[in-house]
Regions:
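Predominantly soluble domains enriched in secretory-pathway, periplasmic, or organellar proteins
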Residues: 1-308
């Protein structure tokens, strides 16, 4: 067993039906921020002591959290109010909101250019509402909107190539947007499995990991865009995280409620741990090799140590 259960962090009860979504860790303060969508709040966990700290309120339908350690910033995608939030970890009261497209979800950040991409899931009843919003994070201003062919999922930024990768659920694609020209889609990568959902990048070996609704994990070469391998999963995945030090990949699967861990050197499955039905999202503390699986029914986080 690679993933050892250390215990649980009790989180606030759900105010409305639902649960949690994307999470991110700020290294310097050892704070984990998780979108508690059911509560319109960002819950904050102390990763050193694995205990709940407090919640940041009034983030309607918050769906995602992203941290820039380089710029000391935290971003939120507030799907219920069509805004993104921006604040410094030591100044939560200074949280600023920027209007973006319809129902923002995925977030990725280019620290070199201060450019935030918000991937908007849109509304099927509103024509042309599947978009990407590009935001100047330092000036708190949306600078451009890019129409895309379908519902967006997660997104990541590749610092070496200076490009954003964005999953599109249908048609199954990864879109490429460059920092140099953040007003259009530069390239489209066809994905050989329906429903690209979770996405992460191995910046050293230049590989993209794309977890698809069709219970498949697709591995691509980031520069050539070629598909290298496809792996069957035990269910439809959502959030994934790549551990750059141990070179492990973690995949959250809400049904049946498991986390699968892979060795990315040979893509061998290392472990499968039971979480809870509906537990589709994770947080990863790279400093301590700890994984947090968010359990919606019992409103808590299961904490695992990756023993390598």
């Amino acid at each position: 067993m690679n993933l050892e259960l250390l215990g649980h962090v009790e989180l606030p009860e759900n105010v409305k039906p639902g649960g949690f979504d994307h999470a991110a860790v700020h290294r310097a303060s050892a704070k984990l921020y998780v979108a508690h969508t059911a509560n319109d709040a960002l819950d904050v966990i102390d990763c050193v002591h694995d205990r709940y700290s407090h919640s940041i309120q009034n983030l309607t339908g918050v769906a995602g959290a992203l941290v820039s350690d380089e710029e000391n910033l935290v971003f939120t995608s507030n799907r219920g109010e069509n805004t993104i939030g921006i604040f410094a970890p030591d100044n939560e009261a200074g949280l600023a909101k920027v209007d973006v497209g319809i129902r923002p979800n995925g977030l990725a950040y280019d620290p070199g250019n201060g450019l935030l991409l918000a991937a908007n899931v849109g509304d099927q009843g509103v024509p042309d509402s599947f978009t990407l919003s590009m935001v100047n994070a330092l000036q708190h201003q949306m600078t451009s909107s890019i129409q895309v062919p379908g519902r967006t999922r997660w997104t990541v930024f590749d610092e070496r190539a200076e490009v954003f990768y964005v999953n599109i659920a249908d048609p199954g694609q990864i879109l490429v947007v460059t920092s140099a020209e953040p007003t259009r889609v530069a390239q489209t990568i066809a994905i050989p499995a329906p429903g690209p959902h979770g996405l992460d990048l191995d910046p050293d070996r230049r590989r993209l990991f794309c977890a698809c609704d069709a219970k498949q994990l697709v591995i691509l070469e980031a520069d050539s865009r070629e598909t290298l391998k496809r792996i069957e999963l035990s269910g439809s995945p959502d959030v994934i995280f790549f551990n750059r030090v141990l070179r492990h990949l973690y995949v959250a699967i809400g049904d049946p409620g498991v986390v699968e861990a892979f060795n990315t050197e040979d893509m061998r499955r290392l472990d499968t741990v039971q979480t809870e039905p509906g537990a589709h999202t994770l947080g990863f503390d790279a400093e301590r090799n700890k994984l947090y699986a968010f359990l919606p029914k019992t409103h808590r986080a299961a904490v695992y140590a990756d023993k390598g």
